[in-house]
């Protein structure tokens, strides 16, 4: 079970655990070490009869002096009378954003049943490189299915829901044929010597695409409880549930003690303390009853005792507050001695609304306002909106109410007319929080931009059922600026701020308006994501029209390079260094180092 590979110079091996892949996979980790001019690989598993073994070193081997990698070196041997030589290659992408996934395990089964991925180790394996590309070598003739696995448990099959996986319904038979490729011979790092036609064996399939995803976390458990601020504590769950946890105070009265907020998915729950006495109490001990998943995934009742402690204790907060008061009193005393106006009562800070989009606004957006604490009361009769027509101000109709799924955020909706000026005037005490703090009076102008400041973008989509499509306009960082559903084959984007943009699309199979991950047990692939491969420049006053055949090019080539975060390693530079070194040593350049 020991393999020794000899070299003509001293070598070293880097990160063998992650870079070197033995196939068939070894459940007992092989021992791999470099000793002088040789590499010794000791396989601790019992070798299987009549099987081709491959030891893929990737770029782990390099010379000891200059660190030039050998690159893409694989050692093969067989325990039978023949060596299987077929190869299968392709790419693994993140299903949610088409990012190449580096270092994920990719493997094959000739057992085509769905259960095999959850019961038996992969038969032949490889790992992806920085481009998400993989090559599985030493494959025997047969019919296969390919899988990818972020193997957290190290057992080469899918047994943890938190593991990223990929699967495909496609089956294939490996094959090969003679082919010709064009290779470049470099004179040096800048100049090409010649381009030659090199015969080689082309292995198929070479274009497998696997979309990796992580299952939606449905096992429910309490992640943590924290009390960052003295007036609230927050519970984080792995998965939401409509039933809110029940709390029984052990050292305080919990009846009507809280105002409860929850996130859209109900996986984060915030309890605001109503009573000042509880806010000033450093330790809140409580009995918490909530639903948790048992080992079978069934929701059962769980009872825990929890202590909620603030980040800063009451005594320290009071000392800091006293320092602020002392500083204020000294300032007032200075004013008094100078015979200037001063106060004798420490002012109470008003409730401060945080207005968003309140000075300049797009015609298709609304003004938002958020608060740091929950409101007890708001009076819309104390909110006034005026529009300027010619030189006169007139009342403008509006609606004011909570913003969906965003706690403590409200939306001022109105018919914002392009180029118009508005005045938003709020009377004092229009807003009052649960602690009795009231807002001060405020007045601010709102300017609606003109149509001449925008571009319009029309995207004519084809190649896919556009009734299920959501087209997204992306900024230079890949963030979603706008999203629409196409109508009559055209996605229409209005009021686009001038700039450079990209496009992506979701094939919304279930019509819920968001991307959904896959489910292996349900044999459901993740919903499709697509990218328009070119940048789009939108200029003010321009109507831009683009045609996009969503499925025209493979998804491995769709995502614009500017948006790809997982950048490919500089393989060309490394191979050039090997070519230069071979030239210095006066030896022929091996085919695998020609670019």
Report the location of each language-model feature.
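N-terminal targeting or signal-anchor segments and their processing/structural boundaries
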Residues: 1-595
């Amino acid at each position: 079970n020991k393999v020794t590979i000899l070299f003509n110079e001293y070598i070293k091996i880097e990160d063998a655990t992650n870079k070197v892949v033995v196939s068939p996979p070894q459940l007992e980790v092989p021992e791999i070490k470099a000793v002088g001019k040789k590499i010794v690989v000791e396989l601790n598993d019992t070798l299987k009869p009549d099987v081709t073994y491959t030891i893929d070193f990737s770029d782990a081997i390099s010379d000891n002096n200059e660190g030039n990698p050998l690159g893409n070196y694989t050692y093969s041997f067989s325990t039978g009378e023949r060596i299987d030589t077929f190869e299968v290659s392709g790419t693994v992408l993140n299903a949610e954003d088409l990012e190449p996934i580096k270092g994920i395990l990719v493997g094959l089964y000739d057992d085509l049943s769905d259960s095999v991925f959850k019961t038996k180790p992969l038969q032949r394996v490889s790992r992806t490189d920085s481009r998400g590309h993989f090559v599985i070598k030493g494959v025997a003739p047969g019919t296969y299915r390919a899988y990818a696995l972020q193997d957290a448990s190290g057992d080469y099959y899918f047994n943890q829901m938190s593991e990223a996986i990929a699967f495909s319904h496609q089956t294939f038979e490996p094959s090969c044929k003679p082919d010709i490729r064009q290779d470049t011979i470099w004179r040096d790092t800048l100049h090409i010597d010649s381009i030659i036609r090199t015969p080689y064996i082309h292995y198929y399939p070479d274009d497998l695409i696997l979309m990796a995803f992580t299952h939606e976390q449905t096992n429910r458990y309490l992640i943590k409880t924290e009390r960052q601020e003295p007036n609230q504590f927050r519970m984080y769950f792995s998965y939401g549930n409509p039933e809110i946890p029940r709390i029984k105070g052990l050292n305080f009265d919990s009846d009507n003690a809280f105002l409860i907020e929850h996130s859209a998915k109900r996986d984060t729950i915030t309890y605001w303390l109503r009573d000042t006495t509880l806010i000033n109490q450093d330790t809140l001990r409580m009995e918490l009853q909530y639903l948790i998943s048992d080992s079978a995934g069934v929701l059962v009742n769980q009872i825990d005792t929890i202590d909620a402690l603030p980040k800063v204790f009451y005594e320290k907060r009071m000392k800091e507050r006293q320092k602020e008061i002392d500083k204020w009193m000294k300032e007032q005393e200075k004013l008094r001695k100078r015979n200037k106006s001063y106060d004798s009562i420490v002012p109470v800070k008003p409730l401060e609304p945080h207005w968003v989009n309140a000075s300049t606004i797009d015609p298709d957006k609304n003004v938002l306002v958020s608060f740091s604490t929950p409101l007890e009361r708001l009076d819309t009769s104390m909110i006034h909106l005026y529009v300027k027509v010619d030189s006169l101000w007139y009342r403008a109709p509006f609606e004011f109410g909570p913003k969906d799924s965003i706690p403590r955020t409200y939306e001022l909706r109105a018919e914002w007319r392009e180029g118009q000026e508005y005045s938003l005037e709020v009377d004092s005490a229009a807003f009052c929080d649960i602690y009795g703090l009231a807002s001060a009076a405020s007045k601010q102008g709102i300017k609606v931009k003109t149509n001449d400041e925008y571009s319009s973008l029309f995207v004519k989509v084809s190649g896919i059922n556009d009734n299920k499509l959501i087209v997204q306009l992306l900024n230079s960082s890949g963030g979603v600026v706008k999203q629409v559903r196409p109508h009559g084959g055209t996605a229409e984007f209005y009021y686009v701020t001038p700039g450079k943009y990209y496009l992506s699309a979701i094939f919304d199979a279930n019509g819920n308006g968001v991307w959904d991950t896959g489910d292996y047990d349900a044999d459901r692939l993740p919903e499709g994501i697509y990218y328009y491969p070119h940048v789009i420049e939108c200029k003010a006053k321009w109507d831009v029209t683009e045609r996009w055949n969503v499925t025209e090019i493979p998804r491995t080539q769709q995502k614009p390079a500017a948006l790809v975060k997982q950048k490919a390693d500089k393989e060309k530079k490394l191979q050039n260094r090997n070519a230069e070194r071979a030239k210095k040593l006066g030896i022929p350049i091996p085919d695998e180092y020609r670019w």
